[in-house]
Amino acid sequence: MHLKRLAITNFKNIADARLRFSPKINCFLGNNGMGKSNLLDAVHYLSFCKSFTGLADAALVKRGEEFLTMRGEYDRKGVDEELQVGLLPGKRKSFKRGGKEYDRLSAHIGAFPLVLVAPADQELVSGTGEERRRFMDQVISQTDPLYLDHLIRYGRALQQRNKLLRDHAVDPSLYLAIEMTMERSAAYITRARQEWVERLTGIFGRYYERIAADGEIPSISLKSHLSENPDGLMALLDSTRRHDEIVGHTSVGPHRDDIDLWLNGMPVRRAASQGQCKTYTIALRLAQYDFMREAARMKPLLLLDDIFDKLDATRVERLVEIVSEDIFGQIFITDTNRDHLDHIMSRSANDHRSWMVEEGTFTLMASSAGEPDADDAPQQQPTA
């Protein structure tokens, strides 16, 4: 799968852009704050129906403007597909595939698989369990629609149970139906997470070793209440209800799962250097790519946002070697250092294109495909 063309109007600092992409390597060069990451965020939005920054839709509309639109043209398994997004603050979001509006946006997740490697991935190591659960859920949801359905059902039931706890409800019958729903979905969620961690572990270790190549031993494991308690979630909820009534929320369940990250038998957050942490998160994302490629039976888009920061020259060289391989499909790379991008393009025999990014405008610098077409003309920012 690859994104052939992208049209953007009023997305963050991008007033107007019309870009035609290489099916392999696309590089974006520019200083910080110029719009490189915003371009990747637009591509991410078309796959996930939301920004990777966590901003609300209304905050994505360019300052001073009243709407935003995006249109992406894809080659998906040899079939032309088009996605369209329209946002008008205060109105319902429009998200169309092939001109048809989605009834449920959750039905879109996984249809256009994508893996993002970004500076915020540091939170996978240093952040809370919520960050690592989000990572698990995003990956598995793209490959298993039923998993996403169970996440939604569990989340709704969890909110209902928490409301009963806050209202100091004491009638056991009020909890029964809710907790039965939670248990059914929790069993599926936990099983899917366990299987995913087991499959990811070996792939992740191989990528880490290829980048680090210094004998470091990484490992990951799922930390789950249900894995440690075979009696099921309802038994756990019953045993903790008195405590939950006091604190006003549910203290056990998949919403409290975590991933333990280890390096040489020590927690990564305590023992690893910045370079080791960066290597760790990149290896996790590349393992995610392999997992999704096999599950979806197509190559996801790979977005690499400022990935070379905090890596020494040797690890940069090894990473460039990895992402230049044919196992990866279409790649979007941003950097402030032209040498990094030139090195990637020189190492790859594949088609490539590169742009200079300044204040939300994109100027084609180089293309292995020859002369630019109309889509590649620099887009001028409107004047007041």
State where each predicted segment sits.
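Short, flexible loop segments at the rims of nucleotide/cofactor-binding pockets, characterized by
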Residues: 94, 308-310
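Conserved lysine of the Walker
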Residues: 36
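An accessory alpha-helical subdomain
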Residues: 123-212, 225
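H-loop (His-switch) motif in ABC-type P-loop NTPases
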Residues: 334-336
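Short, flexible helix-adjacent loops and helix caps
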Residues: 51, 166-170, 294
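Conserved NTPase motor "head" modules and their coupling/switch loops across ABC/AAA+ ATPases, GTPases
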Residues: 1-31, 45, 173-184, 188-303, ...
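Nucleotide-state sensing region of NTPase/ATPase domains
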Residues: 47-131, 137-143, 147, 201-206, ...
